[in-house]
């Protein structure tokens, strides 16, 4: 079954798993995991610390960008380079995120142009830094005459990527998942001009999908912080874990909820 025929919960879980797999360096394991999810072709991109995978079958092509690795200096440097620079479209984008994509884009663009046929659909996903990279890549598709536009973009724990003018140019449908107090979703700060893109899907302190008011969200964040303290965890960091995103999205895909809320 093609991705476009899946429900939103099913797609959200699939892309979360692919975004998680993108952290794996063992190509043999990655191919095995990808096959279990229905993908027959796997390609790894790696240049100057910027990394992504291409997962492909007869119907779909997915670019999954790898997120921040604490042991990789380039990843940390990319996160810290928050100064905005001119984008390919309009307004300004995060300097570090753009630089990471600049490293990989020629290879990714060449492969997409070469391998995508009229029956293939193009998708992007990523977690953390990978979410930001996937956002920048998806936005570039609209300005490339040689390839089709991306179907949709799925991100998990994404930082803000660009200024409002940049966000307005985004043509790809963006499903942006946020887990309660995930600290990465709060940076770079809006005070220096950055804005989130896409439709937010919020997971509350119990891992259930909600659309809270500002007041409800404030209370839910306090609840999450208190629950983290009781577990001996820093909630802002544990909520960024891809494991938690996947666990909650598995419940969502099954139509289940945590009974506490």
Model-based region annotation:
Residues 1-125, 129-261:
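Non-catalytic, mobile gating and regulatory segments of ester bond hydrolases
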């Amino acid at each position: 079954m093609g991705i476009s025929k899946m429900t939103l919960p099913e797609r959200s879980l699939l892309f979360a798993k692919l975004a998680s797999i993108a952290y794996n360096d063992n190509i043999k394991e990655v191919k095995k995991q990808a096959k279990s999810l229905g993908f027959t072709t796997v390609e790894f991109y790696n240049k100057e610390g910027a990394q992504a995978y291409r997962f492909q079958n007869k119907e779909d092509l997915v670019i999954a960008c790898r997120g921040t690795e604490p042991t990789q200096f380039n990843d940390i440097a990319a996160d810290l380079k928050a100064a905005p620079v001119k984008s390919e479209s309009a307004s300004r984008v995060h300097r570090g995120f753009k630089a990471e994509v600049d490293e990989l884009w020629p290879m990714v663009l060449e492969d997409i142009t070469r391998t995508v046929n009229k029956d293939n659909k193009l998708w992007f996903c990523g977690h953390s830094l990978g979410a930001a990279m996937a956002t920048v890549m998806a936005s570039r598709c609209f300005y490339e005459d040689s390839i089709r536009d991306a179907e949709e973009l799925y991100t998990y724990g994404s930082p803000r990527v660009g200024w409002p003018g940049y966000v307005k140019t985004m043509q790809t449908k963006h499903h942006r998942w946020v887990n309660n107090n995930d600290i990465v979703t709060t940076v770079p700060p809006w005070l220096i001009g950055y804005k989130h893109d896409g439709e937010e899907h919020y997971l509350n302190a119990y891992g259930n999908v909600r659309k809270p008011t500002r007041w409800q969200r404030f209370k839910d964040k306090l609840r999450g912080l208190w629950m983290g303290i009781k577990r001996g965890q820093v909630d802002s960091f544990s909520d960024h874990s891809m494991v938690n995103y996947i666990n909650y999205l598995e419940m969502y895909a099954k139509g289940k909820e945590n009974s506490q809320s």
